[in-house]
Amino acid sequence: MSATKRSTAAVMTALLVACFAFQLNASMLSPALERMAKELKTTDDVIGLTQTVFFTSAALFSLFLPRLGDMIGRRKLLTGMMALTAVGCVLSALAGMTGSVALLFVGRVIQGVAGPTVPVCLIMLRVAVPDPKRYGTLLGVITAVNGGIAGVDALAGGWLAQNFGFGSVFWTMAVIAVLAAVAVAFLTDESLVPGDHRMDWSGTIALVVAVGALLTIFNELAKLSNANFWLVAGLFWLAALSAVAFWIQEERTSQPLVATVYLRSRSTWALLLTTTLTMTGVFAVMNGLVPGLAQNTGYGPGLGTDVVSFWTLTPYAIAGLLMGPVSGTLAGRFGYRKVLRVGLLGTVLGLGAILAISPSATPVLLLAVNVFVGITYAGMSNIMLNGLGVVLSPNDNPGYLPGLNAGAFNLGAGISFAILPAVSVALGSGLDGFQGAVITGLVLLALAFASSLLIPAPAVEKETAA
């Protein structure tokens, strides 16, 4: 432990820079993908696969790195994560100079080590800020940054790629990652779980294989009629057998990655179920279907690709960014579960509004519903789900639930883009298909609200009530 305790302002500065570094890796490339395909003389599908590789890598690292941080020290872990992320960024930038697609894949896999940045930051913040109300507010700030800096990150990525080539995007990411590593190393205190602990690598490998197989299944199913269903079947059995192996390993080892008593607890399975259902219900709607509606010339307003984000994704991100600190403050006063449920109900209403306006959507109406769902989902539900992953964790293993919850976010996003577009295609490519997919999202969100009722009260809420 450090002899001098850092100020909350110093800790927040370091954690925000780290979250910003991760967010750039996740979102800054989106407008540069077409340029990358041209510069590397490859197809859009191959470049899209590099994105899938990054997000899959991020999801898998999220499963166990927070727990590793409990043992070796979270400052040490996060500093190393940022340093490795910078290495991955440099390799990806060099791919642009050498024209090597293989090097780009390697770089993106390494960049995925930044996947659990937000869970690790939230655990470090909780150690630095023990006051529940103040922690709630600051949690909202950090998690809101994770939702994107109001779309500026994507706009900057597009501008850099257009003017200096896609390699400049990765060099920018590398610089920010190095700054984050330095900030975390010098502006935060070390924290870990005291005692003699060993990492359960056998259980970790089994869990990573199981979740990796599931993620690959849903990535494959997203191809719809082009999916390899023999591969899906094989991966299903691999996931099932790995999950069984994981459970057996956790039962038999003296120092499990996650004790089975915790896996059986509602603190674990109810939260993970709620996170997965929420992401499945809303993610593809707001990040795929609604922008698609905005650009549709048949039943939508027919917005161009150059302005569609300003009416959909950007106001959605801004609303979430502004609402985050507010919802965090409300959670500190009224409880995480109450704010989560209000957010989920609001998101159900928001998707209902999208359904209602879809036959005659205008840019202004799209702007309004995106702002509303940005408040209720990005600014409330998403932040409360992240926060609950931290405050529901036991003192002897604070890293396992934030890590599994991060995996649930990624799994839900993958399922969302597999199920909802498939529903849309099955019902036809027109308005009926769009509405059917949104209704499916509504049903899933209603189930998420129902499962949220099973989440037990965190100890911090019990203490506040007492």
PLM segments and residue spans:
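Extracellular/periplasmic helix-loop-helix junction of adjacent transmembrane segments
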Residues: 30-61, 100-105, 306-311
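Membrane-interface helix termini in secondary transporters
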Residues: 35, 63-67, 71, 159, ...
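Central cavity-lining transmembrane alpha-helices of secondary-active solute carriers
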Residues: 52-67, 119-123, 314-326
